[in-house]
Amino acid sequence: MSQCTVEYNVSEITEYVLSTLGERCQSAGIVIPTVIIYGTIFLLGLFGNICTCIVIAANKSMHNPTNYYLFSLAVSDIIALILGLPMEFYQSLDYSYPYRFSEGICKARAFLIEFTSYASIMIICCFSFERWLAICHPLRSKIFSTLWRANVLIILAWTISFVCALPIAFIVQINKLPLPEDAKYQPWTNKVSTDGIFVLHTEFCAMNQSRPDQQKMIIIFAFTVFFVIPAIAIVIMYAHIAVQLESSEIDLKGDKMVKKRRNKSNRTVLKMLLSVVITFFICWLPFHIQRLLSVYTTWSETTTISPPVQFLSMIVFYISGFCYYSNSAANPILYNILSQKYRSAFCRTILGDHIANFVFKGHQRPGQSKRCSSSTEAEQRTLMTRGSVRVDKPHRKLEVHNY
């Protein structure tokens, strides 16, 4: 009998396991696209974020607060990709249950993914605040926006994220599917269970299924504190920045050319950072929707879930997975698309001056400077700036929060 086949000596138990946990193995129609998409995300994300760290570290002209935040964000993305995607690959190719690994691995993976997701949003809040301060309160910015303060905020962000993610390590465990009440005292019970409590071969890594209230509390806390509140704060800050830049265009005093250049530089940087923020929230919204769906469709008076809700949960599962990991690969692409100065530093650092100039030589229009040619120190000084966990088994009818 294939390992993918769910079959017990008692047909009622077979139906119960299938209706609750779903099939053990995913179909080829799901596995192949999933592996291709995740493989592409993994390679692009890992390469792009490692290059981002190298570019920022290797160019002293990029050692400024905003780039320190972007470096930290790249580190968070690298951790998420390395810890998350290999397990996604494995679970796509292997059977979904029983869980093969130890409870320590189960807890560690869940904690680290939650930890890095919290760190990402806190870093995004930090560089949004830094830009808001620099444009709307420039005098205060000169005191606040220093490398030392940026390092302190980054350490603080990671520390807070670590502490807030700790509950995950305590509530996540290897669960087993409990026997139905009417099956606990049957003559055939010992054929499907060794302890008379749980069904054989149904282990899965997830939050403790006997503590639904705590599961809800953690997911709602993460959604509120690390998604809704940051989103509101960031919208307010960028709205204030937009108003400030618009008013500065109208009321240009002193050296108009200097102020125009400064505003243009600010707008370029803001365009890139705002793209990072928007991408983050677009990619993470399905993730949080899926987590909320998982707890509010699972923990009701009955475990029966209507077919439309099952279908919606499955669709949101796939969308949330692809979006969640796509966000980790998107930032380096945005930097290259939206920042010519980053492209220049990227090409010079990764490819070298001679190779970069040769590669891009044929792509220059008359009078246009080479995109990867060496920039002056003054140009580089302004480079790029002036101055949580899904349910693992999509096909289950009972959507539990898995890792």
Swiss-Prot record:
Extracellular domain ranges by topology: 1-27, 90-109, 173-216, 290-304
Localization, UniProt: Membrane
UniProt main location, coarse: membrane
UniProt-listed PROSITE patterns: G_PROTEIN_RECEP_F1_1 (PS00237), G_PROTEIN_RECEP_F1_2 (PS50262)
Residue ranges of the TM segments: 28-48, 69-89, 110-130, 152-172, 217-237, 269-289, 305-325
Keyword match Membrane: yes
Gene Ontology molecular function, alphabetical: neuropeptide receptor activity
Domain of life, source organism: Eukaryota
The keyword Isomerase belongs to this UniProt entry's keyword annotation: no
Membrane topology per record: Multi-pass membrane protein
GO biological process entries: neuropeptide signaling pathway
SUPFAM superfamilies: Family A G protein-coupled receptor-like
Cytoplasmic side: 49-68, 131-151, 238-268, 326-403
Keywords: G-protein coupled receptor, Membrane, Receptor, Transducer, Transmembrane, Transmembrane helix
Family assignment from sequence similarity: Belongs to the G-protein coupled receptor 1 family.
Protein task: Putative G protein-coupled receptor for pyrokinin-like neuropeptide derived from the processing of the neuropeptide precursor capa-1.
Name of the featured protein: Neuromedin U receptor homolog nmur-2
Organism, as annotated: Caenorhabditis elegans
